[in-house]
Design a protein with these regions (language model features):
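Alpha/beta-hydrolase
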Residues: 222, 226-307, 311, 330
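Conserved HGGG/HGGXW glycine-rich cap/lid loop of the alpha/beta-hydrolase fold
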Residues: 84-143
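A catalytic-pocket lid/entrance helix-loop region that shapes and gates access to the active site
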Residues: 198, 202-240
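Conserved loop-alpha-helix segment in the C-terminal half of the alpha/beta-hydrolase fold
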Residues: 303-345
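Catalytic active-site module of serine/aspartate enzymes centered on a nucleophile-bearing elbow/loop
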Residues: 337-374
């Protein structure tokens, strides 16, 4: 394929053939790099139908020719300087797109990249380069026993070091934070927005006090009150690691507001991520309760600073979330270049329980940052 000559890949987005396929147009630039644009959906041509696929070039897109992480399948352990010395954090690149590079910030604090793995079913077909990343203390990254490192500003500095190591800049760098990750993304944008091309704030209010009020005034009154009383009693007695506490939360809170699927149907990456949460980070920062925040983040509020974030920003909320969707809509209105995406069937993990809305809205936002043509 010569420079500028396009070819088209049509990828099925639903194995049953009920959703239109997406058309991704690829061309080779003069410098040899691949560039793609993702058009709107084209008519469905039947189940499992892939047309005009150039397998060799598709493989190049995934392998990232000339990238230093090809041998490791996209994995890089990034050295991070901290006040207590150097540690390493785990990252994994998927895809190769010079214009759209998305770094994913997981929640918790202390959760893992794993619950983002559902993105693999959607972002590659849209030609988006994205990075999994376990923050320090999480999953595959170093896990120092150092409570003094679990500070917001220290995490912001870590993200900046990761950005530099991965070679991301304002021509391509999108940052997506979900839950605690959105807190971190807001803080990063307030300090380093000159490096951002765009920002995605997923399922997180800009004020922990407002979140606590929503939990107390809206979520808790709708719960079974006997179950709520037992949950509170277990929290007050410090028994949040008791299996009974988790069972009560699952039945009366999680399947309503965290992931609206029966527990036995929760996707394996979500179950795995929940099992790997580092409570040595989570409890000091978030607090032991799942019905509000009482840790180091309890007073965090950046609502009054949102107007300072000038990069294009997508705010994602959900009808059944633990986070007030009206508050998230207001966040988008406060951001100079904000837009709001509402997931009417979704909860805190709307990327799973309202996947079609979430992924199509995210991809549309990222596609807006591409060149229209070579």
């Amino acid at each position: 394929m010569s420079a500028g000559d396009p070819f088209i890949i049509e990828l099925q987005t639903d194995g049953a053939g009920s959703i239109p396929v997406a058309r991704t147009t690829w061309s080779r630039c003069g410098d040899g790099a691949l560039r793609c644009t993702c058009d709107q959906a084209v008519p469905n041509r039947g189940t499992n139908n892939v047309t005009e696929v150039d397998v060799a070039v598709t493989r190049q897109w995934f392998d990232g020719q000339g990238r230093p992480d090809v041998l490791s399948g996209g994995v890089r352990m990034v050295p991070v300087r901290t006040p207590l010395g150097e540690h390493r954090v785990w990252t994994k690149r998927v895809g190769n797109n010079p214009d759209v590079k998305l770094l994913l910030l997981h929640g918790g604090p202390g959760a893992t990249h794993e619950y983002f793995e559902g993105f693999d079913s959607h972002l590659p077909g849209a030609g988006i380069e994205y990075y999994y990343y376990d923050q320090l203390g999480s999953a595959y990254s170093d896990q120092p026993a150092a409570p003094e490192l679990w500070q917001v500003d220290r995490f912001v500095d870590e993200v900046e070091q990761v950005r530099v190591a991965l070679g991301l800049d304002s021509s391509n760098f999108y940052l997506l934070g979900q839950s605690w990750g959105a807190i971190l993304a807001i803080e990063y944008a307030l300090q380093h927005q000159e490096h951002l091309k765009g920002l995605v704030l997923s399922n997180m209010m800009s004020s922990i006090p407002a979140y606590n009020r929503y939990a107390e005034q809206v979520l808790m009154p709708t719960m079974d009150q006997a179950a709520l009383a037992e949950i509170k009693a277990l929290e007050d007695s410090g028994q949040t690691a008791d299996p009974r506490y988790e069972a009560l939360l699952m039945e009366h809170h999680y399947v309503q507001h965290v992931l609206r699927l029966p527990e036995q149907d929760w996707p394996e990456p979500v179950v795995r991520s929940f099992a790997h949460i580092n409570r040595a980070i989570y409890v000091p920062m978030q607090g032991p309760s799942e019905l509000g925040a009482s840790g180091l983040l309890a007073g965090w509020d950046r609502t009054g600073d949102l107007h300072r974030i000038e990069v294009p920003t997508l705010v994602i909320g959900a009808e059944h979330d633990t986070m007030d969707p009206a508050h998230l809509r207001e966040m988008a209105a406060r951001l100079p270049r904000g837009r709001y995406l509402h997931c009417p069937r979704g909860s805190h993990l709307a990327m799973y329980d309202d996947q079609e809305t979430y992924m199509s809205g995210l991809i549309d936002f990222l596609a807006a940052g591409r060149p229209t043509a070579d």
